[in-house]
């Protein structure tokens, strides 16, 4: 017996990384030694002091029961304290912070709180696929906002049609940016605040990569800007900063009304974050941060390896100041998909076609730096052998 899927599921595109995982599995089944530069999943272990904190709490029976759907007070306090130390932002942990099962979950659920069927959501293009996916599931209409090299991969707010802006309920932004590696200034965030005020839009800033930065650069928080808390919230997690992608601990912080609405939705959908994981996240946020510095130095070395290799082959790339991604144009004679397919077939190396992140990702590909350095070196040598000199 077959069943008719709901329109919201039929309208949902296949998740990009599920497709990449299938391609890798298919090639491995053929006996190919595949090197994946596709998915951004840290290859370094979670720091010992975080694991030890979890082991301690795991032995306490009370932690095996249902957690608070909003998050333990101690967890929300740790998030607020981290914001104060890192950004100088003072948050009320009871009203302005809610725990998430990783920031992806909150990003996907946010449109359900503020988007009715037919409402518009402004999503960056190229951008993290969950912005559009969550919008579609809520019945909203994703409106792509182009991120182009000519504008530093920042949205041109003035180019968004006024009629579209008036219909928009939510706007997603993401800096440091996945997939482009672009960064945003406080001045840009201030312009976003003004835009959101003018049109009554809720701004959702995805700050997942704020701690993965190089060369002395320290990315700002959207919440540092005057008025940001009136118009928006920020999503973050411990995943990238502390190599905890599998632990699933994140948060949303900022506008109290938006935080409350998201928490209310979640209380009807899930049972919160396992308390042991929350205690591990507290240890991460409150504990020593020298491991984060070492992590960034490792990614900086990998960044330089990839950028130098590609530039030797004919690219003209600048070194991104943040994230663990390299965003690069495809050579002449290819589109994003054909180039990724050719590299996989000839070199056994997986790169992500830019079109996986939206229409404006055409002509680009993304490389992730989250694999052991010796394998990254081998991947670069395979690209040398496969491509030789390239032109554009």
UniProtKB/Swiss-Prot annotation:
One of its GO terms (biological process) is lysine biosynthetic process via diaminopimelate, diaminopimelate-aminotransferase pathway. Keywords: Aminotransferase, Pyridoxal phosphate, Transferase. Its cofactor is pyridoxal 5'-phosphate. It is an enzyme of class 2 (transferase). Pathway: Amino-acid biosynthesis; L-lysine biosynthesis via DAP pathway; LL-2,6-diaminopimelate from (S)-tetrahydrodipicolinate (aminotransferase route): step 1/1. Pyridoxal 5'-phosphate binds at residues 103-104, 128, 178, 209, 237-239, 248. It catalyses: (2S,6S)-2,6-diaminopimelate + 2-oxoglutarate = (S)-2,3,4,5-tetrahydrodipicolinate + L-glutamate + H2O + H(+). InterPro entries: Aminotransferase_I/II_large, DAP-NH2Trfase_DapL_Desulfo, DapL/ALD1, LL-DAP_aminotransferase, NHTrfase_class1_PyrdxlP-BS, PyrdxlP-dep_Trfase, PyrdxlP-dep_Trfase_major, PyrdxlP-dep_Trfase_small. Pfam families: Aminotran_1_2 (PF00155). Involved in the synthesis of meso-diaminopimelate (m-DAP or DL-DAP), required for both lysine and peptidoglycan biosynthesis. Catalyzes the direct conversion of tetrahydrodipicolinate to LL-diaminopimelate. This is LL-diaminopimelate aminotransferase. It comes from Desulforudis audaxviator (strain MP104C).
